[in-house]
Amino acid sequence: MNRDFKADRPNQKWVTDISYIPTKQGFLYLSVIRDLYDNSIIAYKTATQQTINLVLNTIRAAKRKEKVTEELQLHSDQGFQYTSLAYFNLTQSYGITQSMSRRGNPYDNALAENFFSILKTECIHRIKLQSFNEARKVIDEYIYFYNNQRIQLKTKLTPIEYRRQYVA
């Protein structure tokens, strides 16, 4: 993507990444896909281990939910999940064009990282999560809030409201 994070329509450019959510049981890993058109979280999955399947299942969930065209670019960092043959094969089978950050350059995936910063600042760091199940519930509620109720500064709308304007 060469840091060109502007999308003119839904499902043109997605970014993906994994972050960890601390709980008393250990870390819960959260994989998300964010649409750069409206900043909505298209799909997300959680797991107690950071595996290739966590990422693959997130892509599958996004594919079930959204229309994927050959124009779609999916940007990630160079984590082992995103450089795996399984990831390459799945994105190719869906007609998704892969894009990756340059090695050692976190700014290339800034918009995926930005969502995790918002999630942790507004939600996760305010509570002490006791369990994986509690963390999953909190993440579910926050992502619903983020997509459907949280106003984006740039558009003055929620991600879903902004997306509906394109479809209308």
Please identify what each model-predicted range represents.
Residues 1-9, 105, 160-167:
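Basic, flexible linker segments flanking DNA-binding modules
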Residues 1-32, 56-57, 65, 69-72:
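Mobile-element integrase/transposase regions
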Residues 5-7, 23-24, 78, 105-108, ...:
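Conserved, non-catalytic sequence blocks in retroelement Pol enzymes and Pol-derived host proteins
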Residues 26, 45-67, 83:
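Active-site beta-loop-alpha junctions of metal-dependent nucleic acid enzymes
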Residues 35-36:
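Short, acidic, Ser/Thr-enriched surface-loop or helix-capping motifs
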Residues 40-41:
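Hydrophobic "anchor" residues
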Residues 76-78, 84-85, 100-120, 136-139, ...:
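RNase H-like two-metal-ion nuclease catalytic core shared by retroviral integrases
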Residues 92, 96, 118-168:
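C-terminal domain-tail junction helix/linker
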